[in-house]
């Protein structure tokens, strides 16, 4: 419950930031109304298009049971065990080792893994990764993360447009009488940074829960712990290149564990995640599967 409240508060802060940007840049009640409308449209768009956006960003390709029988049957088996509809299965054409889930609810969900992760993880570790992604679907984290990514992207886009306007003289002084000059400057400089920090904080609140859900679903926390360690090392060697706004969807990232790394990381430190999994191992009954 604590993580859910924190996530809701962070999402509200992100939408509030989008509204504030419009207010400061456009000025007055018009800016406020436009900001509220933009936030509403962005969130509604994310609700219906979140899966399509994420899959397109990573160029994920759908696969059938005949094309990837081992992966397909693993997703099917774990979905049955979790008592959720089987999500669509995708493969990302990249040697970077990673995975993600997307979709607004379990009935409209998808799980995607890279070619790289299929090549390097043994079955028990891959099972832990798939179970982690299915837990995101069960918890509706996939929608939360997609909305956060889309709103953060809208904030960055708006700030970039304002920046271009300032540099290239778009609009006269009379056209912008309602705008607050200091607000415009602060928007261009700080809004994308603030949006990124909030978005990444949202992601970090969900990862421990997904790890724990994976451990309970497979009965094998240690396998996921090994997978996370292996994936972190490989992610630094072969990163999965895409829009940074969608990095929180991935199971692992490659940002260092220093203070600034933690602040701008979409995930908790891998060491902390591994420690939590090994602690959970002591609390779980003997693996039944």
From Swiss-Prot:
What InterPro entries does the record tag this protein with?
Answer: HtpX_protease, Pept_M48_protease_HtpX, Peptidase_M48
Catalytic residue positions: 133
Which residues make up the binding site for Zn(2+)?
132, 136, 207
EC main class here is hydrolase
Taxonomically, the superkingdom here is Bacteria
Stored Gene3D superfamilies: Metalloproteases ('zincins'), catalytic domain (3.30.2010.10)
Any keyword Transmembrane? Answer: yes
- Membrane topology category: Multi-pass membrane protein
Q: Where are the transmembrane segments?
A: 7-26, 31-48, 151-171, 182-202
- Its name, as the record gives it, is Protease HtpX homolog
């Amino acid at each position: 419950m604590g993580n859910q409240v924190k996530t809701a508060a962070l999402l509200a802060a992100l939408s509030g930031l989008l509204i504030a940007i419009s207010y400061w840049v456009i000025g007055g009640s018009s800016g406020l109304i436009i900001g509220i409308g933009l936030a509403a449209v962005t969130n509604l768009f994310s609700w219906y298009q979140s899966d399509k956006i994420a899959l397109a960003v990573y160029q994920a390709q759908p696969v059938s049971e005949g094309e990837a029988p081992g992966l397909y049957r693993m997703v099917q088996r774990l979905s049955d065990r979790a008592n959720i509809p089987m999500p669509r299965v995708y493969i990302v054409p990249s040697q970077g080792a990673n995975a993600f889930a997307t979709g607004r609810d379990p009935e409209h969900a998808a799980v995607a893994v890279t070619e790289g992760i299929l090549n390097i993880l043994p079955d028990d570790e891959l099972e832990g990764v798939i179970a982690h992604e299915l837990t995101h679907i069960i918890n509706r984290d996939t929608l939360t993360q997609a909305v956060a990514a889309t709103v953060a992207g809208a904030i960055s886009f708006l700030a970039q447009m304002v920046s271009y306007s300032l540099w290239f003289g778009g609009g006269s002084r009379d056209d912008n009488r309602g705008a607050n000059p200091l607000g415009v400057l602060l928007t261009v400089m700080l809004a994308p940074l603030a949006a990124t920090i909030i978005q990444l904080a949202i992601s970090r609140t969900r990862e421990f829960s997904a790890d724990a859900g994976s451990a309970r679903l497979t009965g094998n926390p240690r396998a996921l712990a090994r997978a996370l360690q292996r994936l972190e090392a490989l992610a630094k060697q072969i990163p999965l290149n895409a829009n940074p706004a969608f990095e929180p969807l991935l199971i692992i990232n490659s940002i260092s564990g220093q203070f600034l790394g933690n602040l701008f990381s979409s995930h908790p430190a891998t060491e902390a995640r591994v420690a939590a999994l090994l602690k959970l191992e002591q609390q779980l009954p003997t693996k039944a599967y």
